[in-house]
């Protein structure tokens, strides 16, 4: 996919471009879940600074006007940049089709847009289990069925990663099945339920499609934060399943000891 000197406006995160001259390109990440979440229209200032002219996160709509003027670009600028991305059906809708070929084709289409706009990692698909009907992000996830979940995540991954230099990020590993207090909640789950329900989808997707990245969840599992779990991140994910990509955290969840021991990339996104 070539060197990325430019961060796609609206991208969720980017690594340094200071090593490009040494042959190490920077990495650009874009959120999902329904295709790439990028700024559709951005303004480019005379100094080359690029800002989206519309909020791409809903809460920004409610910020005071002076704050928005600082954060957002000028829609009347003579130098505007356009990025048109496709709004694909969300996970629960795709899974309702029971059509794995369709899911792979959707992934391939997302990958083509990633390549066009210089995005390396798509922070999707989300594949947590539909355990609680009140979970505010169930629409992103595929199903209450771990087999269906794993198969659809694998199909989308295969589609995206057909495109050179484009990768998915399976999330949120694992047991992140509610949004309420998800930063602190403790999922108490026995080994059989953990293996057969909450890990099974991730296992299928990792083994069948070899994703480029996995995002760890905020919550604890049986009293230990997933970010600090050698068992879940190394023994299970890497040693048992053979995962060899990046493990990244959710927004600002990485502690000092986690960086030292388990994580290869600190990720500040959701």
Where are these regions (language model features)?
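Glycoside hydrolase catalytic-domain context in secreted enzymes
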Residues: 1-270
């Amino acid at each position: 996919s070539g060197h990325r000197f430019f961060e796609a406006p609206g991208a969720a995160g980017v690594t340094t471009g200071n090593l490009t001259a040494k042959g190490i390109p920077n990495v650009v990440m874009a959120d999902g879940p329904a295709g790439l979440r990028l700024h559709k229209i951005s303004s480019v200032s005379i100094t080359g600074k690029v800002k989206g002219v519309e909020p791409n996160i809903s809460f920004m709509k409610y910020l005071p006007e002076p704050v928005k003027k600082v954060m957002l670009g000028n829609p009347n600028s003579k130098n505007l940049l356009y990025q048109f991305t496709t709004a694909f059906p969300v996970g629960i809708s795709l899974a309702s089709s029971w059509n794995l070929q369709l899911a792979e084709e959707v992934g391939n289409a997302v990958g083509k847009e990633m390549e066009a706009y210089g995005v390396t990692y798509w922070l999707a698909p989300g594949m947590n289990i539909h355990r609680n009907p009140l979970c505010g992000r169930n629409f992103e996830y595929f199903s209450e069925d771990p087999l269906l979940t794993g198969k659809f995540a694998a199909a989308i991954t295969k589609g995206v990663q057909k495109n050179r230099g484009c990768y998915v990020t399976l999330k949120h590993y694992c047991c992140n099945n509610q949004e309420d207090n998800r930063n602190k909640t403790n999922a108490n789950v026995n080994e059989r339920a953990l293996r057969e329900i909450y890990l099974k989808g991730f296992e299928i997707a990792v083994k069948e499609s070899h994703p480029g990245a996995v995002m760890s969840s905020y919550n604890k599992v049986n009293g230990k934060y997933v970010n600090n779990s050698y068992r879940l991140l190394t023994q299970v994910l890497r040693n048992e399943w053979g995962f060899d990509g990046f493990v990244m955290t959710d927004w600002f969840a990485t502690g000092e000891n986690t960086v030292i021991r388990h994580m290869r990339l600190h990720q500040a996104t959701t």
